[in-house]
Curated annotation (Swiss-Prot):
GO terms for cellular component: mitochondrial intermembrane space; mitochondrial matrix. Its cofactor is Zn(2+). One of its GO terms (biological process) is proteolysis involved in protein catabolic process. This is Presequence protease, mitochondrial. InterPro entries: Metalloenz_LuxS/M16, Pept_M16_N, Peptidase_M16_C, Peptidase_M16C_assoc, PreP_C. PANTHER family: PRESEQUENCE PROTEASE, PRESEQUENCE PROTEASE, MITOCHONDRIAL. Belongs to the peptidase M16 family. PreP subfamily.
Length: 1012
C-alpha cells in the first residue's frame, strides 16, 4: 500500500500545477505565459518565453522517466540547394565548447540515451534526444545547445558533409605516391548529403512526393536538397543561413518527462542569455492558389524493372483546404480521410483499387495538416496511361456519393475507439511521439495547447456531429469543386540515363570553372587533389584527437543487476500460457505462436500472402468491410505473421511458426479472440472474388518494391548475406528478403486471366494448419482481469481445430550460398553487407563480439566508410541470438573501397591498442539498447518469443560489463580474421552493375517468371 501511495504522490507532484510558476512569473530568465493540466494524457503543459531573445519553450511534465529534449529552428529553404539539410549535418561536426571532429557521433557511445538524432523538415530543423538518466540529459543538452548555437562550421566539414569535387579513390593516391591509376584519379562529385539525396532520388515514391511538394508549395523549396542544385551551394551561403536562422529568437525548445523544469531552464537560459533579440523568420508559406480552377502537371520519373511496364503511372488530385489552427475542423478532415480510404471496405479503395484503376495509393494520398493550410490528396500508383484521366473523374464521383449518403455512425465510432485505445496504451516513447505530433503544427502557428486538448476536441466534434450533416458539409465545402491540382508522374525508360548524363554535364561545367580559376587543367586537378588529401588528413585526426572535453556517463552508472519481470506459466486453458500481470490501463495484450515442424519451403514463402489475404477476403458470413468495422469497434488491432527464432543455446537450430497478436479493452477480449479465429479459420478462399483480390494484394506489394529496397537496401543486403550462414537467417530471408520480393513480383506479373489456382490451393493448405497444433500463448493484463481472460482463452482454444497437420520429416537444411553475390538494381548508390557465423546466445564469446561491433563502428568504420568514403552510413553489428557478426554500408558511392575496409576491419581490431576509455564507450553504447525503456506489452517477450530466460539475460549482462581488451582482440582474431581466411563469409551488394563486379561475383538478376 505504501509503495502505491508513494507512486501516486509522485505522479501528482510532477503534474501538480501548484509547484510551477504562475502565468507572468519568471524563472531563470523565462516568463511563464500559461499552463494547463491535461488529465486524459496524464500531463501538465507549460508554455514559457525567454525574456531576452523571445525563444519559446514548451515543457510537458509527466510521470515518465524517459525524458525528451529538442531544440528546433524555423528554416524556410531559400532554394533547392539543401542548405537546411547540409547545415543540420555540419552543425554536428564541432562547436566552440566541443571543438573536436564530429562530437555528435562521438557522443553516441558516451550516452545511455535511447534516441539521438537530427531532422530536416520542409520548413524547420530540429534536434531531439531521449534518455532516462539525469546526468546524461544534462550532458546531451549541453552538446545539442552548443552544436546548434555555436557550431564551428569549418569549410572542411562543409565539403565533407555537403558537396565537393575530388578524386574517386584518394586513399589510392596516397598509397601510390603520385602513380595512381586513372580510375582512382577520376574526378567525381562527393559529399554525404549529396550521396544521401542521390539515393533518395532513386526512390520513385520520394521523387513523386517531392515533385508534388514543389508544385503544391511553389514558395517552399526542397529542404533536403536536389542533387542537381546542391552543387550550387557555397560555404558562405551556409554560414549566412546559420547566422540568420539558428538563433534563439527563431527557436522552439521542447522538454518532456519527470525531470525538474527549473534545472532545464537554468541550463537553457544560460546558453540563450548571450544572444540579443533579432527579427525571427516566422513566414508561413501557403500552397498554390487553386481558386481559379483546375491545374494539371505531368512529369517523368524512373521505370521499375520488376513491375508491369504498362502500369507505372502515378497520379493524384489535390485540394487546398482551410487553416489547420482550427483543430476541430482539422481533426474532422483527418477522420474523413480515414473513413474514405482506410481499409478494404472503404469507398475510395473499392472504387479505385478494387475496381482495377490502380494497384496502391500514391505517396501523397491523405490529409496533410502539417502546413498552415491543409492539403487533401487522393491518388493512385500502378495506373495504366489510358486510365489516368479516369482516376480524377472516379474520385469526384465517389466524393459526391459520400456527400449525399453520409457516413454510418458505427464507422465513426470505430475511429474514435481507436483513439481511445491509443490514449490508454502505455508506450515507452510517448514523449518522442508527442514531440513529433506537436512540432510541425507548432512551427506553422498552431497552438500546441489546442493540439493537446484531446477531450475538448472530441467533445466539440461530437457537438458538431450531433447537429447532423457535419462531415458531409465539410466534403461539400472543400472537395465538391474543381479547384484542384492534378499531378501525374509518367515512367520514362531513359530517366536514369538522363539523370546520369545531367550529372556528367554538370560535373564538366564545374570542373571547367575550377580550371578557369586555376589557370590550367593540370593546376585545377592538382588543387582538387590537394584539397581532397587535406580533407583526408583532417579526417585521419579523428582517432587520435583528445576527447576529454566531451561529457560522458560511466559504466559504473549501469546497475549490475537488472530487476526481473515477474511471469507466471500455466496450462489451465489447455495450452502453455505465460501471464504477465501489470498495470495496463484496462487493456489486455495477447500473443500466440503455433510452432510448425518441417514446413515446406513453398508454403513458408506464401505465409506473407496468406496473412495479407485473411485481412482482405472476408468469410462466407461476413464481408471484409464488416470485419474491419468490428476490429475497429472492439479491438486495438489483430494481426497474424510469420515468426522464427534461433535456439539460445544452439544457433544452428531454429523454430518457426505463425504468430498471432491482438489488443483490446478487457471487456472486449472474447470478441478479439473470436475475430482472430474467424479471420484465420473462416476466410473464404473459394469466393468468386478471391483470385482477383489476391492478385490486387500482389500488385500492391510489387508496386514500388524497388523503392522499398532503396529505403532500406542495407537490411536486404544483410538478410541475403546472412541467409547463407544459419537456418534461422535462411527462414527469415524467405519471408522478408529479396527471395520474397522475387516471388511477389513474379506472381504479380501473371496475366489477368490466370485464376491463381496453384497459389490459392497452397493458401488453403496454410489455413488448415495455421491455428491447429502446437499453440502457446502469452497474456499481459491487470491482475483483476486474469480470471475472465483465462475463461475467454479456454473458450478460444476449444473453438480451434483439434488435429495438428504434420509434414514429412526433412533432411538437414541446405542453405549454402555463393561467397559473393551481386544484385543489379537501378540505384545511383550501393547497399552492401558482409556476414560471418559466430556462436550461440549463451556462449561467453558473444559479449566481447558485441563490444567489438561497437568499437569497430564508432572508432573505425564510421570514419572510414562515411567520413572518408562518403556513404550515408556504415558500420558493424552483432546478432547474438542469431550467431552472426557482420558489416554493412548504406547509400554508398564507393563499394569497392568499402568492401576492402570491411575485410581489413578484423585485423585492424587485433592490432589496435584499445584504451580503457574505448572499452567504456563501447559498453555504454551496448547498454543503450539493453536498458532501453519497454512498453508494458513488450515486457517478458524475450522469454516468450525466443526462450531467453532472466538467468540468461543476467549472465549476459555481467559478461558485457566484464569484457576485457584481450577478449575483444581474441574474438576479432577468431571470428573475423580467421573466419575470413577460411572463406566463411557471405557478401552481398545491391546497385548498378559496373566493371568491378567481375567473374568472382555470382550475379543474381531479379527476373520474374510467374512461378511459385
Amino acid at each position: 500500500m505504501l509503495r502505491n501511495a508513494t507512486k501516486g504522490a509522485a505522479r501528482r507532484a510532477v503534474t501538480e500545477l501548484s509547484q510551477y510558476p504562475k502565468p507572468g512569473e519568471k524563472l531563470h530568465g523565462f516568463t511563464l505565459l500559461r499552463s494547463k493540466h491535461v488529465p486524459e494524457l496524464e500531463l501538465t503543459a507549460l508554455h514559457l518565453q525567454h525574456d531576452k531573445t523571445g525563444a519559446e519553450h514548451l515543457h510537458i511534465a509527466r510521470d515518465d522517466s524517459n525524458n525528451v529534449f529538442s531544440i528546433g529552428f524555423k528554416t524556410n529553404p531559400p532554394d533547392d540547394t539543401g542548405v537546411p539539410h547540409i547545415l543540420e549535418h555540419t552543425t554536428l561536426c564541432g562547436s566552440q565548447k566541443y571543438p573536436i571532429r564530429d562530437p555528435f557521433f562521438k557522443m553516441l557511445p558516451r550516452t545511455l540515451s535511447n534516441f539521438m538524432n537530427a531532422f530536416t523538415a520542409s520548413d524547420h530543423t530540429f534536434y531531439p534526444f531521449a534518455t532516462t538518466n539525469a546526468q546524461d540529459f544534462k550532458n546531451l543538452m549541453s552538446v545539442y545547445l552548443d552544436a546548434t548555437l555555436h557550431p564551428l562550421l569549418k569549410e572542411t566539414d562543409f565539403t565533407q558533409e555537403g558537396w565537393r569535387i575530388g578524386p574517386e579513390n584518394p586513399q589510392a593516391l596516397v598509397a601510390a605516391e603520385g602513380n595512381a591509376k586513372p580510375e582512382d584519379r577520376k574526378l567525381v562529385f562527393k559529399g554525404v548529403v549529396y550521396n544521401e539525396m542521390k539515393g533518395q532520388m532513386s526512390d520513385a515514391a520520394y521523387l513523386f512526393w517531392i515533385r508534388f511538394q514543389d508544385h503544391i508549395f511553389p514558395d517552399i523549396h526542397n529542404s533536403g536538397g536536389d542533387p542537381q542544385k546542391i552543387t550550387d551551394l557555397t560555404y558562405q551561403q551556409l554560414k549566412k543561413f546559420h547566422a540568420d536562422h539558428y538563433h534563439p529568437s527563431n527557436a522552439k525548445v521542447f522538454t518532456y518527462g519527470d525531470m525538474p523544469l527549473a534545472d532545464h531552464l537554468k541550463e537553457i537560459g544560460a546558453q540563450l542569455d548571450v544572444f540579443e533579440k533579432i527579427r525571427a523568420d516566422v513566414a508561413h508559406h501557403s500552397p498554390i492558389d487553386l481558386s481559379s480552377g483546375p491545374r494539371e502537371v505531368k512529369l517523368y520519373g524512373p521505370i521499375d524493372p520488376l513491375v508491369d511496364a504498362n502500369k507505372q503511372f502515378k497520379t493524384s488530385v489535390s485540394w487546398v483546404l482551410g487553416e489547420t489552427n482550427n483543430v476541430v475542423e482539422s481533426f474532422s478532415l483527418a477522420l474523413i480521410s480515414a473513413l474514405l480510404m482506410d481499409g478494404y471496405g472503404s469507398p475510395l479503395y473499392k472504387g479505385l483499387i478494387e475496381s482495377g484503376l490502380g494497384t496502391d495509393w500514391s505517396p501523397n494520398t491523405g490529409y496533410d495538416s502539417s502546413g498552415k493550410l491543409g492539403i487533401f490528396s487522393i491518388g493512385l500508383s500502378g495506373v495504366q496511361e489510358e486510365d489516368v484521366p479516369k482516376v480524377k473523374a472516379k474520385v469526384q464521383e465517389i466524393l459526391r456519393s459520400m456527400r449525399d449518403k453520409g457516413f454510418e455512425r458505427s464507422k465513426i465510432d470505430g475511429y474514435l475507439h481507436q483513439l481511445e485505445l491509443g490514449l490508454k496504451h502505455k508506450t515507452a516513447n510517448f514523449g518522442m511521439s508527442l514531440l513529433h505530433r506537436l512540432k510541425p503544427k507548432w512551427f506553422v502557428g498552431v497552438d500546441p495547447f489546442d493540439s493537446l486538448a484531446w477531450n475538448d476536441t472530441i467533445a466539440a466534434f461530437e457537438t458538431e456531429l450531433a447537429k447532423g450533416g457535419y462531415l458531409e458539409g465539410l466534403i461539400d465545402k472543400y472537395l465538391i469543386n474543381d479547384n484542384t491540382l492534378s499531378f501525374t508522374m509518367a515512367p520514362s525508360p531513359t530517366f536514369s540515363q538522363e539523370l546520369a548524363q545531367e550529372e556528367e554535364t554538370r560535373l564538366s561545367t564545374k570542373i571547367s570553372e575550377v580550371v578557369k580559376a586555376a589557370g590550367s587543367e593540370e593546376e585545377a586537378r592538382a588543387a582538387l587533389e590537394a584539397r581532397e588529401l587535406k580533407l583526408l588528413a583532417e579526417q585521419s585526426k579523428t582517432n587520435t584527437e583528445d576527447l576529454g572535453c566531451l561529457p560522458s556517463v560511466h559504466v559504473k552508472d549501469i546497475p549490475r543487476q537488472k530487476d526481473s519481470v515477474i511471469l507466471r506459466h500455466d496450462n489451465t486453458a489447455r495450452v502453455k500460457t505465460q501471464w504477465h500481470e501489470a498495470p495496463t490501463n484496462g487493456l489486455t495484450y495477447f500473443r500466440a505462436i503455433n510452432q510448425l515442424e518441417n514446413l515446406p519451403d513453398e508454403l513458408r514463402s506464401l505465409i506473407p500472402l496468406f496473412t495479407d489475404s485473411i485481412m482482405r477476403l472476408g468469410t462466407k458470413d461476413m464481408t471484409m468491410e464488416q470485419l474491419e468495422d468490428l476490429i475497429k469497434l472492439k479491438t486495438g488491432g489483430v494481426s497474424v505473421g510469420y515468426h522464427s527464432a534461433s535456439h539460445p543455446t544452439d544457433f544452428t537450430r531454429a523454430t518457426e511458426g505463425l504468430m498471432f497478436s491482438g489488443m483490446a479493452l478487457d471487456r472486449h477480449v472474447p470478441t478479439m479472440f473470436d475475430l482472430l479465429r474467424k479471420l484465420v479459420v473462416e476466410t473464404d478462399f473459394d469466393s468468386p472474388q478471391a483470385a482477383q483480390q489476391i492478385r490486387q494484394l500482389l500488385q500492391a506489394s510489387a508496386d514500388g518494391v524497388v523503392n522499398d529496397i532503396a529505403s532500406s537496401g542495407h537490411a536486404y543486403a544483410r538478410r541475403a548475406a546472412e541467409s547463407g550462414l544459419t537456418w534461422d537467417s535462411f527462414l527469415k530471408e524467405q519471408v522478408s528478403g529479396l527471395s520474397q520480393v522475387k516471388l511477389v513480383t513474379s506472381l504479380a506479373s501473371r496475366p489477368e486471366s490466370d485464376p491463381l489456382e496453384d497459389v490459392i490451393a497452397k493458401l488453403k493448405q496454410i489455413q488448415q494448419f495455421a491455428l491447429a497444433g502446437n499453440l502457446r500463448t502469452a497474456i499481459t493484463c491487470d491482475s483483476g482481469s486474469v480470471s475472465d481472460n483465462a475463461k475467454a482463452l479456454l473458450n478460444f482454444v476449444n473453438s480451434l481445430p483439434s488435429e495438428a497437420v504434420t509434414f514429412p520429416s526433412r533432411g538437414p537444411p541446405n542453405f549454402t550460398r555463393d561467397i559473393k553475390t551481386f544484385y543489379p538494381l537501378p540505384y545511383q548508390v550501393y547497399y552492401g553487407a558482409l556476414a560471418l557465423p559466430t556462436a550461440s546466445y549463451t556462449a561467453s564469446v558473444n559479449a566481447p563480439l558485441q563490444i567489438l561491433s561497437q568499437l569497430l563502428t564508432h572508432k573505425h568504420l564510421h570514419h572510414e566508410i562515411r567520413e572518408k568514403g562518403g556513404a550515408y552510413g556504415g558500420g558493424s553489428y552483432a546478432r547474438p541470438l542469431d550467431g552472426i557478426f557482420g558489416f554493412y554500408s548504406y547509400r554508398d558511392p564507393n563499394p569497392v573501397n568499402t568492401l576492402k575496409i570491411m575485410r581489413n576491419a578484423g585485423q585492424w581490431a587485433v592490432d589496435k591498442e584499445w584504451t580503457d576509455r574505448d572499452l567504456e564507450d563501447a559498453k555504454i553504447s551496448v547498454f543503450q539498447g539493453v536498458d532501453a525503456p519497454k512498453a508494458v506489452n513488450e515486457e517478458g517477450m524475450a522469454q516468450f518469443l525466443y526462450g531467453i530466460t532472466d538467468e540468461m539475460k543476467q549472465k549476459r549482462r555481467e559478461e558485457l560489463l566484464d569484457v576485457t581488451k584481450d577478449q575483444v582482440r581474441e574474438v576479432a582474431q577468431e571470428y573475423v580474421v580467421k573466419a575470413l581466411n577460411n572463406g566463411s563469409e557471405r557478401v552481398v551488394f545491391l546497385g548498378e552493375k559496373r566493371d568491378w563486379v567481375d567473374k568472382s561475383w555470382a550475379v543474381k538478376e531479379m527476373d520474374i517468371n510467374g512461378s511459385t
